Amino acid sequence: MKQIIAMGGGGFSMEPDNLSLDQYILNQSKREQPRICFLPTASGDSQNYIQRFYHAFQTLDCVPSHLSLFKPPSSDLVSFVMEMDVIYVGGGNTRNLLVLWKEWGLDHILREAWKNGVVVAGISAGAICWFEEGVTDSAGPLTSLKSLGFLQGSFCPHYDGEKDRRPAYHQLISNKFLCSGYAADDGAALHFINDQLFQTVSSRSGAKAYRVMMAEHEIAEIPLPVKYLG
């Protein structure tokens, strides 16, 4: 079973006192004390980000680790990744993440891990990366960016958290710079099983997610049912 959990925002890095999304991700592995690996690539392997990951996940019933491409934990990245139950990708610069992953061959390794049942998840840049394309500020202004294409469609994180995200996503789809896709508020996460949206969950009441597309020459937002984890 292939699983991807794409967060618009939230999780330990944005809600350190509310780990409900992080616990939800762990629960999908169906293993007691799942082995979870954090990929902080998009942040430039920020040590502060890595420390916050451990601070959060050491309070949960799991075995946390991380993969830095600046200081790889193993010369055999394939075996290291394939031994994990969950891969959790942090936020930051999506373009840099994609370039580094491709240079190291990590994009192919992660695809094989996903196909073999490793749960893959991420926030912001770590969510955009799984789709065909997404809205990113990697180069400054919000623009479109081609991504890995594990999932069909585009993705926009921080839909309610950053005021320019929603209008930028609408404009990019309207002008055919992006294909139709999904948008998620901070605190909302889309859970895909075998390439199909299974459900949407949230760490806070009121967090929403949408299917966004062109309909009769206008942008249409279709609200998705959201299961509140509180």
Curated annotation (Swiss-Prot):
It is an enzyme of class 3 (hydrolase). GO terms for biological process: proteolysis. Its EC number is 3.4.21.-. It comes from the Bacteria. The active site is at 124 (charge relay system), 158 (charge relay system). The keyword Hydrolase applies. Keywords: Hydrolase, Protease, Serine protease. GO terms for molecular function: serine-type peptidase activity. Belongs to the peptidase S51 family. This is Uncharacterized peptidase YgaJ.
